């Protein structure tokens, strides 16, 4: 998941500048009779190393590489629970019954998560932030919670407490004290978004 290490200054700082580090390498493509140059662009986000590898002239399109990494950091800033100023953190502080507008990213992620929650009969659930904290998976240490621990009770968790208006792009909590955690979907959502920027006919 998107653990707190991703926001530590020594881990989350971008390499050198906002422009990704260029690392030339050489490889062999089976369809080519000669070696081709591969270029790797690396940055860190969500406590993970991210890399874009492009061949030949495609690797020279630095504006699109920068755009892809900028999109990654933008998504992290919205979905991480390890920054008080993130969008999801603001939703987790929201009083129940108060409806607020949310960004297109949150609409899309929450819409997908609601569908998966319904498809799995509630087994897939991102409204389990309280439970994650009770188990010590937020900032540690990990430990089995007491059966009576407030954060593991049904009333403290569950997408059934989420009211998402897709048409109006708004959100409200139906119950107080429930929290979102996108640790299970954040990286995949970011990969899809970055691939959309780099896909044919633009680069790949």
Q: Which residues make up each language-model segment?
A:
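Residue-level recognition of oxygen-bearing side chains
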Residues: 190
């Amino acid at each position: 998941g998107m653990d707190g290490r991703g926001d530590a200054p020594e881990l989350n700082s971008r390499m050198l500048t906002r422009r990704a580090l260029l690392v030339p390498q050489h490889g062999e493509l089976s369809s080519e009779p000669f070696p081709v140059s591969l270029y790797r662009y690396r940055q860190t986000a969500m406590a993970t190393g991210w890399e874009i590898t492009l061949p030949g002239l495609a690797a020279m399109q630095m504006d699109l590489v920068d755009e892809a990494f900028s999109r990654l950091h933008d998504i992290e800033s919205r979905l991480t629970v390890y920054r008080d100023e993130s969008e999801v953190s603001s939703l987790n502080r929201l009083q129940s019954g108060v409806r607020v507008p949310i960004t297109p990213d949150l609409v899309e992620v929450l819409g997908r998560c609601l569908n998966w929650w319904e498809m799995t009969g509630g087994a897939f659930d991102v409204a389990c932030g309280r439970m994650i904290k009770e188990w010590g998976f937020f900032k540690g240490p990990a430990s089995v919670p007491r059966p009576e621990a407030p954060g593991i009770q049904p009333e403290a968790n569950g997408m059934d407490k989420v009211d998402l208006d897709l048409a109006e792009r708004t959100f409200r909590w139906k119950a107080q004290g429930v929290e979102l955690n996108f640790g299970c979907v954040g990286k995949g959502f970011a990969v899809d978004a970055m691939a959309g920027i780099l896909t044919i006919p633009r680069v790949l």
